[in-house]
């Protein structure tokens, strides 16, 4: 998992509350367990005018030239609601997003973001509204998200602070998912298995 330290990136606006996981990545695309290849289907029903995904909807924000290469998604309340699917953060990350900023998230989606190397930032509604105004009024506007300082710096230089659990912060900062955390305990696992083989050898009979 790629470490998250400081992110300087273009912010794309998705001015919709209650965006559910079936809008983030529709169910018909959940046909594999690899994490890649989902970005093209992100927000499929909004991005495209046809089911085949060949005709872009020029009215959808992410299709606008000004948001090309965006790595931060600025959106509204209750983002990621609906059914649980880890493919949702996979699709966002595969598209190019490393962080989301919103006033609130659905709990399961919020947790899945951290497990997949994405930082879901929670700011007050009025702070998100202020960032919406700044970004919409400035083409190519960039934000800076500093995980260590737990700050978001807007286009005008104004700084916003956010909270993040210390363990999740450690994992993101060091690029550690559940597998990475387990591998860090490799020597202890090896010692345990060695002792277990001595006292319970039948467990290792093939």
From Swiss-Prot:
Transmembrane segments: none annotated. It catalyses: (2R,3S)-3-isopropylmalate = (2S)-2-isopropylmalate. Keywords: Amino-acid biosynthesis, Branched-chain amino acid biosynthesis, Leucine biosynthesis, Lyase. GO terms for biological process: L-leucine biosynthetic process. Pfam families: Aconitase_C. It comes from the Bacteria. Pathway: Amino-acid biosynthesis; L-leucine biosynthesis; L-leucine from 3-methyl-2-oxobutanoate: step 2/4. GO terms for cellular component: 3-isopropylmalate dehydratase complex. GO terms for molecular function: 3-isopropylmalate dehydratase activity. The keyword tRNA processing does not apply. InterPro entries: 3-IsopropMal_deHydase_ssu, Aconitase/3IPM_dehydase_swvl, AconitaseA/IPMdHydase_ssu_swvl, IPMI_Swivel, LeuD. Its EC number is 4.2.1.33. HAMAP family: LeuD_type1. Catalyzes the isomerization between 2-isopropylmalate and 3-isopropylmalate, via the formation of 2-isopropylmaleate. Belongs to the LeuD family. LeuD type 1 subfamily. Heterodimer of LeuC and LeuD. This is 3-isopropylmalate dehydratase small subunit.
